[in-house]
Structures are given as C-alpha cells and as structure tokens.
C-alpha cells in the first residue's frame, strides 16, 4: 500500500496527517480553518486519496502557519508514499471548469521543485481565509514533494470558485501523476534512472 503518516510539531502548529494514495476519496479534516478543510475535502475526493488531517495552530495570529504547514505535511506524505516513484505515470494535467471559472493544473513529479502560479484572486478574503495563503499552501507542498507544478487560471471572477477549481484540479492532476503505469510496472519513469 502506498501510504504515509506525518507528524509535525513546532511552536506554531501541531499536525497529524495520514494519506493513502490508493484510497476512495475519504476525508477527515480538522485544521481549525473551515475554508482549508473544505478545499482539502475536495482535493481528496477528486484525487481519490484517503486523507486525514488534524492541525492545532496559532490561529489567534492568523491562518498562515496552519495553511503553510499543512501544505508541507501533505507534500512530505506524498513523497513518503511514492517512495522511489517506481512504476508511476509521473505526469498529470487537468483542465477544470467550474461555472465561470477555468483552471489548468499540470505537474511533473521530477524531484525538482517549481511552482508556476498564474492565479488572479479578485478578493483578498473568502470568509476569514486570506486568499494569498493558497499559493503558500502549494509552495509548501512542492518544496516537500519536489516536482514542477503549474496552476494557471484561464477564466474566473468568483474567488471561491477559482480556489475550488485549483484544489479540485490539483486532486485530479496528482491522481493521474501518481497512478501506476501498467506498461512500465516497476520502472523508474526517467532515462536517468532516478527521480
């Protein structure tokens, strides 16, 4: 089974996260930030990942540390669950429409971290969530599960819809990238022989 459990304790956050890449989209999320919980539930459902997250953070300050650190832990969990990445497809992409919004997500689980973020969020907040933290989440993820991730908004006016499309699209994208390639079972998907 391709699973991982991560625990991270700092002065700012205490996080427990478990991930099953070959799950059924079951989510049990309690980060202390309702909007992040919603996004992670969508991510898990659309990626068919079983994901459990609990986070106690310094939310009396704001959600920055909690959001970034959950992204870090999710990246670490993907990296651990993938191991040497033997047999995976490696690449994934998805074009996700949601009402007026259209978001393109693509990734290469190459071992080299890069985030291409071309997302224009009209509102600074959705509820009490600072929308700029979505980028911090994905930066935390890609720095701990190194790969190239590109997230590009092609259309959209409603900030909630845009962010929802990002998290759903990344769930679908990573589902494809981590899926097992039956034509190359047991092979590292690189001419270099490692990722």
Predicted regions and their residues:
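Structural preference for solvent-exposed beta-strand-turn elements
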Residues: 1-195
